């Protein structure tokens, strides 16, 4: 027994709701994955604020129809498609997928969309190579901290060097 029209409308509405909260969507070919492997992929993506949705291409096509932000996805809707919907940590989610793909060697990255722009495999890999948001924040904080430390040392050095100069002058007067 197939899905009713009402079921399909609910699925499309759910996909549209998920896409509204999504920053980036990646399309992969999941053919050959077992249910356990798909569950493993979902578990790896969850900490990065991403989810893996598997649905018929026709339903996804209806969900993105008329939405300029996601219409470029239609270029990759063929065969067995799984959709990685990334909401938060782009780099972390891509790295989680890449680790899964490296371990299973069963999926193929087709492409993705971010802010209405289609992304090639190379673009997605480049985003995955970027440091995570936490690492970038730590690097910026470290740079700011080192600047303030150098300024503090510089400010303290002026009176210290003056005191050393006065001490040296005083010592030279005592010696003479």
UniProtKB/Swiss-Prot annotation:
PROSITE patterns referenced in this protein's UniProt entry, alphabetically: RIBOSOMAL_L10
Superkingdom of this protein's organism: Bacteria
CDD domains listed in its UniProt record: Ribosomal_L10
GO molecular function, one term: large ribosomal subunit rRNA binding
Coiled-coil positions: none
Pfam family of the protein (one): Ribosomal_L10
Keyword Nucleotidyltransferase assigned: no
This protein's UniProt keywords: Ribonucleoprotein, Ribosomal protein, RNA-binding, rRNA-binding
Listed InterPro entries: Ribosomal_uL10, Ribosomal_uL10-like_sf, Ribosomal_uL10_bac, Ribosomal_uL10_bac_type, Ribosomal_uL10_CS_bac
Gene Ontology terms describing biological process: translation
A GO-annotated cellular component: large ribosomal subunit
Function statement: Forms part of the ribosomal stalk, playing a central role in the interaction of the ribosome with GTP-bound translation factors.
NCBIfam families: PRK00099.1-1
Subunit structure: Part of the ribosomal stalk of the 50S ribosomal subunit. The N-terminus interacts with L11 and the large rRNA to form the base of the stalk. The C-terminus forms an elongated spine to which L12 dimers bind in a sequential fashion forming a multimeric L10(L12)X complex.
PANTHER family: 39S RIBOSOMAL PROTEIN L10, MITOCHONDRIAL
Family statement drawn from the similarity comment of this UniProt entry: Belongs to the universal ribosomal protein uL10 family.
The protein's name: Large ribosomal subunit protein uL10
Biological source species: Acaryochloris marina (strain MBIC 11017)
Lineage, uppermost ranks: Bacteria, Bacillati, Cyanobacteriota, Cyanophyceae, Acaryochloridales
The encoding gene: rplJ
């Amino acid at each position: 027994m197939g899905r009713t029209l009402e079921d399909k409308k609910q699925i499309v509405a759910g996909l549209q709701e998920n896409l509204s909260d999504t920053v980036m969507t990646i399309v992969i070919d999941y053919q050959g994955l077992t249910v356990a492997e798909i569950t493993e992929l979902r578990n790896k993506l969850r900490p990065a604020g991403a989810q893996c949705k598997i649905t018929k291409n026709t339903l996804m096509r209806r969900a993105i129809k008329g939405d300029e932000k996601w219409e470029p996805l239609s270029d990759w809707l063929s065969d067995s498609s799984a959709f990685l919907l990334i909401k938060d940590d782009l780099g972390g989610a891509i790295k989680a997928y890449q680790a899964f793909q490296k371990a299973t060697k069963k999926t193929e990255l087709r492409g993705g969309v971010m802010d209405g722009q289609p992304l090639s495999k190379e673009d997605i890999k480049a985003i995955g190579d970027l440091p995570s948001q936490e690492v970038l924040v730590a690097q910026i904080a470290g740079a700011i901290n080192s600047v303030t430390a150098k300024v503090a040392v510089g400010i303290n050095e002026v009176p210290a060097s003056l005191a050393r100069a006065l001490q040296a002058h005083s010592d030279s007067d005592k010696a003479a």
